[in-house]
Structures are given as structure tokens and as C-alpha cells.
């Protein structure tokens, strides 16, 4: 009965204050009102600030009224004061836990100011780094740019030299091919002239041979005509001779 009666004072109806217990040491949303949860990290120089000292913190319930209420419910004054002292200790421990795990708005603003100061320090370090390291990098880049320009100029000169050599080789090869073509054309012209000369000689020989053949054929025709006349004469003489002999025999036979 006493335990139930004690926990009744921890309910929301007591003194109009929302003091709610939650298991495993977790805080209820009513206690988190007005606070912002945060995680504490030591990545920067944080200056811890205590806004409300322990002796100036106010309790969340009226201790005197609670002692009187306990006395009216059968507790003597010493027991009531002991219970209230225990409750005060629990309240202070809970508040310490709350102040350790959460921060107030003022603490948040101070932390933000510290973070901004830390960011300013980082920004200054970045400026210094830019003036030192980036200057070295810029100088190195300029040096590399100069070297690249030199290499580029060397490549241009080498390319120009190779192009000039190739142009000279091409001109020499073109001259050689032109001379070779001229020699071939000259040889072809000589061969053509020789062939024309041989052709004319051949045509002349053929013409002479043809004339000789025509002359021989004409003489043969003349000889054949003369032989034909001689043959006709001989045949005619033979026929007349035979007729004469036949008439002689006929006359001789007729006379006999």
C-alpha cells in the first residue's frame, strides 16, 4: 500500500508537474520538452558550460506539501522526510542524467558558436594551405606546362623535319619515275619507228613479189596463148592431112 501511495505522487496529477517514470532509464517525451538531443564528440575543442548549478536547480514537486501528505497517511515526520529526501535525490540524479544527455538552447547556441569558431579556424587553415601547398602546385603546374611546351615545340620541329625529308624523297622518287617514264617512252618510240621501218620494208618486199608474180602470170598466159595457137595449127594441119589422105584413099578405092 505504501509503495503504491508513493508512486501516486510521481503521477501527472501531483503539483501539476509531468514526472513520468520509464523503464530502462529512458526519458519520456514530457521530460524532453524544451531540450534538444545531441551526441557529444571530441573532434573539436569543446568548452563545457554549466548553465544551472546543482544547488540552484528547483525540484519538480513541493517537498513540504509532500511531507505533510505523508504524515496524514500514517507516516511519522522522520519517515516522511526520509522519503522526500530519497525522492529529491532521485530527482536530482534524473536531472543530472537529463543534463548529461541533453542540452538547453543556451548550451546549443554556445556549442554553435564554438563550432563556428572551429570552422573559422579551419577556413584560415585552408587559406594558409591554399597559399602554401596550392602555390607549390601552381608552380609545379607552370613548370610542367613549360616542359610540355618544349616537348610540343620539339615535336613540331621533328614533324617539320620528317615532312621535309618525306617531301624531298617524294620529289626524288617523282623525278626518278619521270626519267624512267621518259626512257620507256623513248624506247617505245624507237621500237615503234623500227617496227614501222620493218613494216615498210615488208610491204615493199610483198609489193615486189606481187609484181613479179603478176609478171610471171602474164608471161605464162602469153605462153599458153601461143601454145594454144600452135596446138590449134597443128591440129588443123593434122585434120587437113588426114582428110587429104582419106580423100586419096577414097579416090584410089573408087578408081579401083
Curated annotation (Swiss-Prot):
Q: Which GO terms describe its cellular component?
A: mitochondrial membrane; mitochondrion
Its subunit composition reads: Interacts with MCU.
Location (main, coarse):
mitochondrion
Question: What is the name of this protein?
Answer: Coiled-coil domain-containing protein 90B, mitochondrial
Ranges annotated as spanning the membrane = 231-253
What family classification does the UniProt entry report for this protein?
A: Belongs to the CCDC90 family.
Annotated organelle transit peptide span: 1-42
- One Pfam family, short name please? CCDC90-like
- Name the keywords, alphabetized: Coiled coil, Membrane, Mitochondrion, Transit peptide, Transmembrane, Transmembrane helix
Q: Where in the cell is it found?
A: Mitochondrion membrane
Membrane topology of the entry: Single-pass membrane protein
What PANTHER family does this protein map onto?
A: COILED-COIL DOMAIN-CONTAINING PROTEIN 90B, MITOCHONDRIAL, PROTEIN FMP32, MITOCHONDRIAL
Per the database entry, which stretches of residues form a coiled coil? Answer: 106-164
Amino acid at each position: 500500500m505504501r509503495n503504491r501511495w508513493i508512486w501516486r505522487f510521481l503521477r501527472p496529477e501531483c503539483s501539476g508537474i509531468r514526472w513520468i517514470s520509464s523503464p530502462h532509464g529512458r526519458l519520456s517525451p514530457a521530460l524532453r520538452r524544451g531540450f534538444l538531443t545531441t551526441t557529444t564528440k571530441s573532434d573539436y575543442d569543446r568548452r563545457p558550460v554549466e548553465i544551472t548549478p546543482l544547488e540552484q536547480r528547483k525540484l519538480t514537486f513541493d517537498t513540504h506539501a509532500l511531507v505533510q501528505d505523508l504524515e496524514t497517511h500514517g507516516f511519522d515526520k522522520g519517515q516522511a522526510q526520509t522519503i522526500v529526501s530519497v525522492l529529491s535525490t532521485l530527482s536530482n540524479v534524473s536531472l543530472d542524467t537529463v543534463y548529461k544527455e541533453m542540452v538547453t538552447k543556451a548550451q546549443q547556441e554556445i556549442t554553435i558558436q564554438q563550432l563556428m569558431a572551429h570552422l573559422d579556424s579551419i577556413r584560415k587553415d585552408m587559406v594558409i594551405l591554399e597559399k602554401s601547398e596550392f602555390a607549390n602546385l601552381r608552380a609545379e603546374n607552370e613548370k610542367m606546362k613549360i616542359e610540355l611546351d618544349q616537348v610540343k615545340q620539339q615535336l613540331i620541329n621533328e614533324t617539320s623535319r620528317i615532312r621535309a625529308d618525306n617531301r624531298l624523297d617524294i620529289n626524288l622518287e617523282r623525278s626518278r619515275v619521270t626519267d624512267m617514264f621518259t626512257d620507256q617512252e623513248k624506247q617505245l618510240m624507237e621500237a615503234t619507228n623500227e617496227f614501222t621501218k620493218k613494216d615498210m620494208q615488208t610491204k615493199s618486199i610483198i609489193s615486189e613479189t606481187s609484181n613479179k608474180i603478176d609478171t610471171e602470170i602474164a608471161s605464162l598466159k602469153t605462153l599458153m596463148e601461143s601454145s594454144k595457137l600452135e596446138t590449134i595449127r597443128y591440129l588443123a594441119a593434122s585434120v587437113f592431112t588426114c582428110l587429104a589422105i582419106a580423100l586419096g584413099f577414097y579416090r584410089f578405092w573408087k578408081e579401083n
